């Protein structure tokens, strides 16, 4: 995947609030790296654009030779659901569904049968050590369990890229460490590209490559 000269700004009164200022980035197959920066640096906005959750004001975005910015919103939604997974600081699980049903959602949105979706979801919950929590609703799960369910949901369609935005930011230090270990295990076993956005220097420096962002630009 490649982002070229990405600019993003928002109207603010009589002026513009510039968030990203000509950022370029390549994501290679199976690569893992962290994007490190303080709050407001622009790192989450970049992740949202790379993940096609938002569009830039200017720039180019390609994946496997396809011009993602030329796609319609419906085309992008289908592409995103099949090729990308997302984990956020907050789990965003649906309270009316149990853990198994939450993990099944991307498969059902993608048109897969209930049988196939259930098989995939059960396999991932077992991998996450949550097979015995499959029937529990979000209000019956701990913070670490909620995040592991969210990670399973992000992986259920076997994406090529996993984007994670402050995935340990809402967890205590012990649980955070366990989730960090899980990400590295997933990267190796599932052979996916992993992009982590964080302000946690300790977490970031565990990656072989770290990009530092400040004021919407890369720091040299």
Swiss-Prot record:
The keyword Cell membrane applies. Part of the ABC transporter complex LolCDE involved in the translocation of mature outer membrane-directed lipoproteins, from the inner membrane to the periplasmic chaperone, LolA. Responsible for the formation of the LolA-lipoprotein complex in an ATP-dependent manner. Residues 1-220 form the ABC transporter domain. GO terms for cellular component: plasma membrane. InterPro entries: AAA+_ATPase (IPR003593), ABC_transporter-like_ATP-bd (IPR003439), ABC_transporter-like_CS (IPR017871), ABC_transpr_LolD-like (IPR015854), MacB-like_ATP-bd (IPR017911), P-loop_NTPase (IPR027417). The keyword Lyase does not apply. GO terms for molecular function: ATP binding; ATP hydrolysis activity; transmembrane transporter activity. This is Lipoprotein-releasing system ATP-binding protein LolD. It comes from the Bacteria. Keywords: ATP-binding, Cell inner membrane, Cell membrane, Membrane, Nucleotide-binding, Translocase, Transport. PANTHER family: ABC TRANSPORTER ABCH.1, IMPORT ATP-BINDING PROTEIN. The complex is composed of two ATP-binding proteins (LolD) and two transmembrane proteins (LolC and LolE). PROSITE patterns: ABC_TRANSPORTER_1, ABC_TRANSPORTER_2, LOLD.
């Amino acid at each position: 995947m490649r982002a070229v000269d990405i600019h993003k700004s928002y109207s603010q009164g009589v002026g513009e609030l510039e968030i990203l200022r000509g950022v370029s980035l390549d994501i290679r197959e199976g690569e893992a790296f962290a994007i490190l920066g303080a709050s407001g640096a622009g790192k989450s906005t970049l992740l949202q654009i790379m993940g096609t959750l938002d569009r830039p004001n200017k720039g180019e975005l390609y994946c496997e030779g396809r011009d993602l910015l030329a796609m319609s919103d419906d085309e992008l939604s289908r592409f995103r659901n099949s090729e990308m997974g997302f984990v956020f600081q907050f789990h965003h699980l649906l309270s009316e569904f149990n853990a198994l049903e939450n993990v099944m959602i991307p498969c059902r949105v993608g048109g897969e049968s209930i049988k196939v979706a259930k098989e995939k979801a059960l396999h991932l919950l077992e991998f996450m050590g949550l097979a015995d929590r499959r029937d529990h609703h979000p209000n019956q799960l701990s913070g670490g369990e909620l995040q592991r369910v969210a990670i399973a949901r992000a992986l259920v369609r076997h994406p090529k890229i996993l984007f994670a935005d402050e995935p340990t930011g809402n967890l205590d230090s012990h649980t955070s460490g366990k989730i960090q270990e899980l990400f590295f295990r997933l990267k190796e076993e599932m052979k996916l590209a992993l992009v982590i956005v964080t302000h946690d220097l300790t977490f970031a420096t565990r990656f072989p490559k770290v990009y530092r962002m400040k004021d919407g630009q890369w720091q040299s």
